[in-house]
Structures are given as C-alpha cells and as structure tokens.
Amino acid sequence: MKRLLCALVLASSLPALHAANGDERVLAAKDAVQRGDRAKLAKQLEAVRGHELEPYVEYWLLRLRLEEAGAAELREFLGRQAGSYLAEKLRGEWLKVLGKRREWDAFDAEYPPLVQADQEITCYALQNRLRLADLGALDEARPLWFTPADLPESCIPLMEQLLADKRLGTDDIWERLRRLLEAKKPGAAKATAAYLPVGQAPSAKTLDAIADKPLRHLALQPSNFASSRQGREMALFAVQRLARTDPAQAAQQWEGIRDKFSAADGGYIYAQLGWQAALRHLPEALAWYAKAGNAPLSDEQVAWKVRAALRAQNWAVVGEAIGQMPKAMQAQPDWIYWLGRAHEALGRQEEARALYQRIAGQPNFYGNLADDELGRPIQLPPMAKPASEEVKAVAALPGIRRALALFRIDMRIEGIREWNWTLRGMDDAKLLAAAELAHRHEIFDRAINTADRTLALHDYSMRYLAPFRELKAMQPDALIMAD
C-alpha cells in the first residue's frame, strides 16, 4: 500500500518536475542568446522540445543566424508559427535585413503578411515603391520629415530625394530643426542642420551652447543678429529654451527683440510661452496664448490652452481652443464634455445637451459627468462573469499558454507582449475570460488591463482588483491606524 501511495505521489509530481526542468533549460537558452553562444543555444533547443516555450528558443537561434539563414528555413518557421507574436517579430526583423540588402523581390513577398510595420520597415516599403516609379511614395514619406524624432536610416534616402526634388525647401528644414530642438533631440537636430544651404547651418557647438545657457546667448548676441536667418532662428531657440525654465524671464527677453521678427515667428514664441505658463498654472498663460493668434499648436499645447481657460473660467476660449484641436482629439469624451460645458455657460443649452448625449452612458468618468448633467442616474452596467468553459477555451490558446509560461519564469516583458498580441481581435466575452485567467494566475496587471479593454460587457470588480483585501481586513484596527 505504501509503495502504491509513493508511486501515485511520484506520478502526480512528474509533470511539475518536467515543467520546472524545461523552464530551467529555457532560461539557460536565454542566457546563451544573450552571450551569442549558438552552440549552447542549439543544444538547449533539443532539450526543450515539447515545452510551451520551444518556439522562443527556436526564434532566438534563428535571430542569431538571421544574416545567413536561408529563406526556406525562415519561411518554414513562419509557416508553423503563422499568426503568432514570434512570427510577426521574426518577419519584421527579416524584412529589415532584406530592405538593407535591397532584396526587393523577397521583401515584396514578406511585407504584406506583416501586421504592424514600424517606421524603419515602412520606409523600406516606400523605398521599394519609389524604385518602381510610384511617386506617391514620396507624398506618403513627406510627413515623416516633420515628426520631432530621429529617423531610421531607411528613411534618409526618401528625405534626401524629397530635398533633391524641391518637395522640401529651406523653410521646411528650419521647421524640422525647430521641432527637434523643442523636443530636445540634439543629435537629429544637428543632422538636420547639415541640409541647410552653405553658411546658414548653425554649428553643433552653437546649438549645445544655447541649449545649456540660453540667457547667455541672448545677452551676447550681436546687435545685427536678425540680419540672417540663422541669427533669428538661434534667438528663437534661446527664448524657447529659456521659457522651459522661466517663462516670465523668457517673455521679458522676447519683448526686447520681438520687433525684429515676423508675425509668424511671434506667434510661435507666444505659443511656447502660453504652453509653459499653462503647465505652471501662471495667470499670464491665456494672454500669451491670445498673442499667438493663429499660430499652429501641437496637441499638447492646445490641450493646455483649454486647461488654462478652464482654470480662468473663460468659457469662450474653452470652446475656441477645442475647435482648434484635430478632429480625432475633439472626438474624445473629455473634450466633448468640456465643449458641452462651454456651450452651457454661454447660454447655448441645446448644443450643450446634444454633446452630453453623445457620451452619456459611456463607462468612463466623462460619460458619468454627462449623465449627471442630463439628470440621469449613474448606474453600473450588469456585471458580466465568464463561464468556466470560456476560461478553459482561452487557457488553451497557444499564445496564452506561452504568455503564462513566460510570466512563470519571470520574463515579464516578453510575457506582456505575447499576452497583448494574443488578445487582438477578442470580443468582450473572451477578454473577460482572459482577465479571469490572469487573475487566477495572480498576474494582476494583465487582469486589470484586459478587463479594461471591454466595450459592452464589463466586470468592474476585475478592473479595480484588491487582491490583498482579506489580509488587510485581518489586521487589528490599531495597526491599520498606525499605517
């Protein structure tokens, strides 16, 4: 009898022992890939056959060999792992190699199945289209010039073609330079300055000096600084940079030189001053925004203009500023609500009510506020709980199994990516089942994040988890007060 019991205990523990052993080998494979040890990685791949994370070890080995791996070998993996996060990741990395090598036929074959192309791959795709005389590729590439960020190497030939074709001019170069300096991207700013005509480009030393001590630059600039575009732009950069630390002093410096600049330049500076003042809740914010006139505002600048107007209870400016927002931004519940409040304050009751009705009933803060404005009770929707069969079905998905295995061995970043990828396209019922599964495995951040994605069916107990509530309740009152 004792032997039978021992045998049963041993048999029941074998799967756990096998999983633990497999987990250790996966971690050993991870160490091997970090060291670039192909031989050890290949050995670990054989050792993890049948483990949930076998595809990860295989992917790591292929990634190390990507430059020399054959197309047939890569496509075989992509075929077996079709639709998975790893297939998407490997395909993206392979496309970058193909684009860099100018192997366009293979690139053409692999690009369409890619779900999420990053900017580097997108630019390779545009290069390929341009190679085939598709001039629309340059039209699509042009907006990238104005993004205040470093551009991947694959985008540079497109930008240089736009410059060569005069589709980007000197004003556009200065515009990108301004945006990069504003975004504190000195490396990209210096690279952009190199495209300016001879004699106009500021030196790297000048840009660094202004970024470090803007007030010193303004104090020491020559009296005829405004006679050149470079002189004016460097003064604008200095005022903009000073405004980030001391808007009042920046405004004082600006007032002393503003007559040397165009109205457009003045609008740019006043928009900067208004934005920085609004961030600090300074009373001058709205006045500076007003002086900016019709100057273009970034999404963040216009949002802070609304907030400054709300603080001042200036409902006319609230409505005006929301009207300056891009359409997608105007459609967000918070700005719909505040536009409704602005209409109501200005006596336009019907317009206000129509806006409240657009968001009333939505399961969010501003939907609740709209309900309140309409005199409707705020009610929680019926709680939706997944059936056990739904949880089992989600638990059986390969991507979910891989994600849970990654969390189990503390590869959280990879686990989150695998989890999020697998959630794509899930309806509310499946999302709630996935949230319940994450909760059972005590992966609380994924439980909350997943439950928060639902559109019609909701479980607020999952969105606002309190996994240690029982432990807290067990503490003596005196100890709770001491906390």
Which residues fall in each region the model found?
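Bacterial N-terminal signal peptides
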Residues: C6-S13
